[in-house]
């Protein structure tokens, strides 16, 4: 089960006391999974050896995402120390949460009381590695900033609010300093390094052809667009397929799909 952090009883505390409470909760959680590669063995060069090639550009550690999505991302995952904006169909956010916690890392979800944790579990999420703050109080950005110190992935629901650029820059700097990744959704956040948008584009498995699917939706196709600073926009089609005991991600580029206005109208 996920860990729920209730801040309602802290309303009488000062801002400093609330922050200290969150930090104590972080210290009680397991440490992050290390991403740093093992150091390379030393190499001894003789006097006649050719000069070594220039050192390659430093590769940033990333948090894992569904394999089908990784092909669309410039670094194959979500770079640590960055802020990512996610919008549209909620399945994309759930898939990222599943990949991160399924790999042994920890996540916190702030201000999203209706997040579909059952769907995340079916995608492979380990809910015992998820801390929930459904009601962060009047300043969810401050709560997120504190949780960046100790949590691999922090998901922040902004509830439609717009974060001032100066405040956003301060949180970006903190994420970079702590090596954590912040996902923001349901609001405006200027300065995100990546912006991911997912929209439902079709379905598979209903009653077509020999009663395929026997009247049940077996797959949902998503159109995903990736944009960001110094990143050429990319688009792709992903599919979520029911396997009987879970949900799997795959590429829908070769799948046959068609539009369904009813499915398009379903809430994300």
List the predicted regions and their residue ranges.
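Detector for small/aliphatic-rich hydrophobic stretches
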Residues: 1-84, 89-90, 94-102, 106-109, ...
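Signal for well-folded cores of large energy- and translation-related assemblies
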Residues: 73-74, 98-101, 148-149, 159, ...
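Short glycine-/polar-rich loops that comprise or flank the Walker A/P-loop
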Residues: 105, 127-128, 150-151, 177-180, ...
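Long, charge-dense
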Residues: 106-164, 168, 173
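Glycine-rich, charge-decorated loop segments at or immediately adjacent to ligand/cofactor-binding or catalytic sites
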Residues: 119-122, 189-202
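A generic local secondary-structure boundary/capping motif
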Residues: 144-145, 171-172, 183, 208-214
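Long, charge-dense, solvent-exposed interaction surfaces that engage phosphate-rich ligands
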Residues: 160-168, 172-174, 179-193
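C-terminal functional extensions of proteins
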Residues: 199-268
């Amino acid at each position: 089960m996920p860990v729920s952090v209730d801040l309602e009883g802290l309303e009488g505390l000062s801002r400093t006391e609330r922050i200290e409470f969150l930090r104590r909760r972080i210290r009680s959680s397991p440490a992050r999974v290390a991403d740093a590669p093992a150091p390379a063995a030393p190499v001894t060069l003789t006097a006649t050896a050719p000069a070594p090639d220039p050192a390659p550009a430093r590769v940033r550690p990333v948090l894992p995402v569904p394999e089908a999505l990784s092909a669309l991302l410039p670094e194959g995952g979500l770079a640590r120390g960055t802020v990512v904006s996610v919008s549209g169909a909620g399945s994309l956010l759930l898939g990222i949460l599943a990949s991160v916690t399924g790999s042994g890392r920890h996540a916190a979800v702030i201000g999203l009381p209706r997040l579909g944790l059952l769907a995340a579990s079916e995608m492979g999420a380990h809910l015992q590695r998820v801390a929930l703050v459904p009601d962060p109080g009047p300043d969810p950005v401050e709560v997120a900033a504190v949780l960046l110190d100790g949590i691999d992935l922090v998901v922040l629901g902004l509830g439609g609010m717009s974060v001032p650029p100066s405040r956003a820059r301060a949180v970006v700097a903190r994420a970079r300093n702590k090596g954590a990744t912040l996902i923001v959704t349901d609001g405006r956040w200027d300065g995100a390094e990546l912006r991911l948008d997912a929209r439902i584009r079709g379905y598979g498995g209903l009653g077509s052809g020999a009663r395929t699917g026997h009247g049940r939706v077996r797959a949902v196709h998503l159109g995903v667009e990736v944009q960001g600073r110094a990143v050429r926009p990319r688009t792709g089609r992903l599919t979520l397929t029911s396997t009987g005991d879970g949900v799997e991600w795959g590429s829908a580029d070769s799948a046959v799909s068609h539009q369904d206005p009813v499915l398009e109208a379903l809430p994300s």
